[in-house]
Amino acid sequence: MEISGWGRYPKIDAEVILPKTGSACASALKDPGLLIPRGLGRSYGDSSLASTVLETTELQYFQEFDPETGALACDAGVSLYEILNVFIPQGWFLPVTSGTRFVTVGGAIASDIHGKNHHVDGTFCEHVLSFDIALGNGEIVTASPTQNLDLFHATCGGMGLTGIIIAARIRLKPITSSDILETTIKAPNLDAVLDGFEKYIGSTYSVAWIDCLAKGADLGRSLLMIGEHATDGGLKVSSKKPITIPMDAPTQLLNPLTIKAFNALYYGKVLQTEQSRRTSFETYFYPLDQMLHWNRLYGKPGFLQYQFVIPTATGREGMRRILEEITESGQGSFLAVLKAFGKQNENYLSFPVEGYTLALDFKVTPSIFKLLDRLDELVLQYGGRLYLAKDARMTELTFKASYPRWQEFEAVRSKYHAIGKFASLQSKRLGLA
């Protein structure tokens, strides 16, 4: 069957295996040949693509929950959406969440997802107590911060290349309201929004929408959104049905003129320098989940999400230079999200380092690849790197120059029988065995 990542580029024909139990996952590994595990397919590029794909979505059961500690044990195919639906009414929330709820627990670990609170709470895997993983030889073992630590650090952020996560134990955090108290600050330029991140470093959540086509004195103008959990107002999950994008949009829908017009309207909708509101967790964390199949907006060719991080020391200069490159190209991004990262963790391939990260969506066109190659050069020049969960075209040279622990990662893969069993289109492109 034809499959792709969320960006719908590239698309390939693959054999898809759907085991219903962890032991069935392990049994599937006895067959010769390479494969890659896959959850709900929300990584954007080719990290979960291979000629043989093992989907974990049938591993979908909750196992145990401790209301005293918030420790949840569940199958790896359980989604963040399902966790929120079950546990928000009981007063619990995810410790870290990505910009979509439609991610499996296994996928969240494999990508070591981050959220709007990285500067406070780190990545998802920093709240993982342990997981069970089927190795390339069919053995099922447990990895945690106290057991098989090297396997734990390699699997967290390891893009499914160490084995098949079949179950996990994570720690949820208590809340007394499902609502978010949001303050939006209008930042007239890049320096102002980066100053805002520093000013609100003690806030639990922070994220900025950035106008990537603004030039001159307006370069980097943004809306910075600060969030805190409300303490009253009930614990509820919306029953409102999302709208559906029914078909591919015309390829000319998103172009520099429409993006520029949208950006002007979006920035202009905030009339005051600072304004506050109470909003639902769905609106604050998952605005795009309100549109099913929103990836169709980019048309049949698909799109590339380009997310990079630049360390704090070079962050301002690097961000400015990259934004200038984008505005000069005229190839703007319809969605541009800026966040501040806290300290780096010990996982070999986890993306975040302390600094600033920007995520951009670009429609697939013949000219976009040249621009992204140029942005790669700038990211490396300023000491940054790209997010593997979003990547579909990074070179081996760029990867190995920006992820200095890749050889340690490969050594752990060899130790735990992953080499010769787990591989994706991405891992082959990046020169991993």
Residue ranges and their predicted role:
Residues 1-433:
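Noncatalytic alpha-helical scaffold of FAD-dependent oxidoreductases
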